[in-house]
Structure formats: C-alpha cells, structure tokens
Amino acid sequence: MDGQSLSSATPLIHHDHRNTWWRCHLQLKNSLSSELSGAVGDLGTFIPIVLTLTLVSNLDLSTTLIFTAFYNISTGLLFGIPMPVQPMKSIAAVAVSETPHLTPSQIATAGASTAATLLILGVSGLMSTLYRFLPLSVVRGVQLSQGLSFAFSAIKYIRYNQDFITSKSTSARSWLGLDGLIIALSSILFLVLSTGAGETHGHNAPSRSQDPVIDDDNDPRSRGSRSSCVNKRLRILNSIPAALIVFLLGLILCFIRDPSIVKDLKFGPSKITLLKITWEDWKIGFLRAAIPQIPLSVLNSVIAVCKLSGDLFPDRELSAAKVSVSVGIMNLIGCWFGAMPVCHGAGGLAGQYRFGARSGWSVVFLGAGKLVIGLLFGNSFVRILSQFPIGILGVLLLFAGIELAMASRDMNSKEESFVMLVCAAVSLTGSSAALGFGCGILLFLLLKLRKMDYSTPSFLTPKSSVDDELSSIP
C-alpha cells in the first residue's frame, strides 16, 4: 500500500522537465515593469553606435532594427536570460574613425568573417575548451577593463557635447537646456534613489532588519517596525521602472528639442535587399575590421558574458559553445542584407540586469519594440535618434559599465587581484582587450611557475596507495 501510494503521488519525470524548462525560459522572473525597465538598460551603447554608423557609413537603420529585433526575440526565448544584442564595437570604431570610411558591404564582410570564426570555434568545441581552462582572474580583468571603459565614455557623454561623426568630444555641456547637465544629473539622482547600488529587485530586496535605526533603542518591536518601514520603502523604490522612465523622458525631449521631427517621419520600412559584395570588400573588411574584432568577440561576447551569466544567474549559466554559435548564426544571416554586425556583450547583460531584467522576456519586449519601430518608421527613425539627449545615454551607459566592473569584486587572493588589475590596466592603456588578455595569461603562468616545485618532477615521484585512496575521495 505504501509503495503504491508513493508511486501514485510521485510526479512524472518528464513533467518536471517541462516545468523546469517553462520556469527557466518562458516565465517572468520579475515584475513586468522591472523587465521593461531592464530592456532599455543597454541602449546607452546601442543607440550611439547605430546612430554613428547610420550617419557616417550609410548603415540601413530599418534593416538593422528589424534583424536585431528578431535576434532579441529568438535569443531571449532560447537562453531564458536577458541576453543582449549589441554592436560589434571594434568594427564600428574602424568603420567611422579610419579613412576612408568602411562601406556597408565592407562592414558586412567584417561581421561575417568574425561570425564564421566564432561559429567554427563553437561547433568544434574549441570555445568550450578555452572557457573551461581560462583563469578566472584574466576574465575578470577583461570585464573590469570593459566596464571602466564604458564608464569613462559615459562620463564624457555627460560632461561634453559629442560629435559622433568624428567620434570626438567637443565643447563642455552647458548646465541648462534640454540636453544639459541638470537633466543628466537629475537622471543619475533618480536612478540612484530608485535602484540604489543595484540590489535585487522586487521581493528579494535587501533587508536591514539587523541594523537598528537608533543605537540606544533596545526595543525589538520598535526595531522591527522601523525595519519593516524601510523594507516597504525599498520594495516601492525597487518596483519603479527607473531606466524605462529615463529613456521615455529622453524620447519626449527629442520632440521638444526639434518639433519638425514629426514632419520628417515617413511610414514604412526600407526595402530589404542583398548587398553586392566584391572580393575587395572581403579583403578590406577582414584585414581592417575583422582581425581586431575577433579577439574582442571571443573574450567579451562569449567568455565574459558566460562568466557573468554564471554570477548573475547561477542556475542558468550559459554554454560558451552555444553563445559562440549564436553570434555566428545571427551575423551569417543578417550581414548579407546590410544589418549591423552584432554580438552578445557582457556590458549589455550587466546593464539590463542592473535595471531589473531577470528573464528572457525582457529582451523579447525590446525586440518587439525594435520590430515595430523598424516596420513603422524605417530609416526616418534616425531623425529621432539624432535628437536623443546624449547626456541621458551617458547616464544609462555609466550604470551599465559600473555594474559590469563590479562583477570583478570576487577575487579572493592578492595574486588573483594582481593578475586582474594588470590585465585591466593593459587593456585600458592599449585600448585592446586582446593585449590585456595576453599579458594577463603570461603573468598568470609566471606566477604559477614561480611557485612550482622543481626539486622532483611530479611525474617521477612514486605514488603511494594512500595517495590513490585520497585521490578517489570526491
């Protein structure tokens, strides 16, 4: 009887698996408002690069919005976390900063070359091997340098007017005006008060019940009442979709700054066609843009984003092979039609998480918004982007960069911190994640060699039965 009742009460295994997949991929992990707020958390990087490529290299904005929309939707559903879709930054930098500027066809070949490399690394298993054996301190150094680089750029956006066509800061930003310092600083104040230092949103808000408000008050009921009020206030503040409100404020200011935008908007997307690509385009795109982009994509778009996903979502750590294949497939589909080369960046994941994104639905909502805009306004949407307050973009980018940099705080030894900081310093000084990565690996190996016992090689040392027994203990 007991066995029968037990078996009848036991849920089926395949039913549990379906429920697990549903919970991981198709359920909201946070409130709808927080997921929507997190969706715009990486636009501080996305908008400036898209705007620059559109103005300088004649990137087809409509095609880019439509394809990146499908990327967002598909990766959000497949990975079950707020997987970002961001521009390939090195390709974008080469395209607009070097002369002559890269053409859309050359940008496409650079993206396709990078994508093919990542696809091969992912399918062959080499990316998983690299991810498994790469020292954590080196990865943290790459993350720290990328986060600080975002933060430095963000401060420039906030303090100075920007000329995205020349990729340079111009005059100091004025205090007043619709893109003045007061707007930017007010946005920072609002985000800090509503989101704090990035504590967990919703019902997991941090509790301070152990800390009495007044030291000489020893009444437990009084302390409990005050801590309850504090927790209630924190829950209310955390429930505010802060980043979404700041972003919507920026959109409203676009139309106030230049009311003629409304007349310039044209309905309907541009025609999606295959690019005409020559062998010369392949040569220029690969040599000038793909070669510097490939190591950055391997480190930041795959290795760093997988490590960060394990930090933020311990039960949903990403597979390096799957992420690498994802980047490859996205670009090998979209680049032929002139879509901007994209990747999965750790900075984007940090930014979206920072403002409340906890599930794949966050980027699904973002993708739906991009799709509507791309189909409704097409290339004319660039008029709105060109008037978006740069100071507000800087604020969003600042919080994303700091969140990414804070992932490096888990170094437990001085040796790990030493490797991480050297890697970050070289990356920032040389403006090359690959250079910092190489120096970090070399330093890591030197430190290991320094502590190695050279008196008797380990493979010549006889191994006792006790050693065998100890090694078998898990």
What function would you assign to each model-found segment?
Residues 18-36, 52-74, 289-361:
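Membrane-embedded helical hairpins/re-entrant loop segments and their flanking transmembrane helices
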Residues 32-37, 41-43, 174-187, 242, ...:
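Hydrophobic, membrane-embedded alpha-helices of multi-pass small-molecule transporters
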Residues 32-40, 53-59, 76-83, 171-179, ...:
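Short, amphipathic, aromatic/basic-enriched membrane-interface segments that mark the entry/exit
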Residues 37-38, 73-83, 291-295, 329-339, ...:
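Transmembrane alpha-helix interface/packing and boundary motifs in multi-pass membrane proteins
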Residues 37-102, 312:
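Transmembrane helix-boundary motif of multi-pass solute transporters/channels
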Residues 39-46, 62-67, 84-88, 178-186, ...:
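Short hydrophobic alpha-helical membrane-embedded segments
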Residues 44-48, 84-92, 302-304, 339-348, ...:
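Transmembrane helix boundary and interhelical junction motifs in multipass membrane proteins
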Residues 99-261, 365-474:
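Membrane-embedded alpha-helical modules
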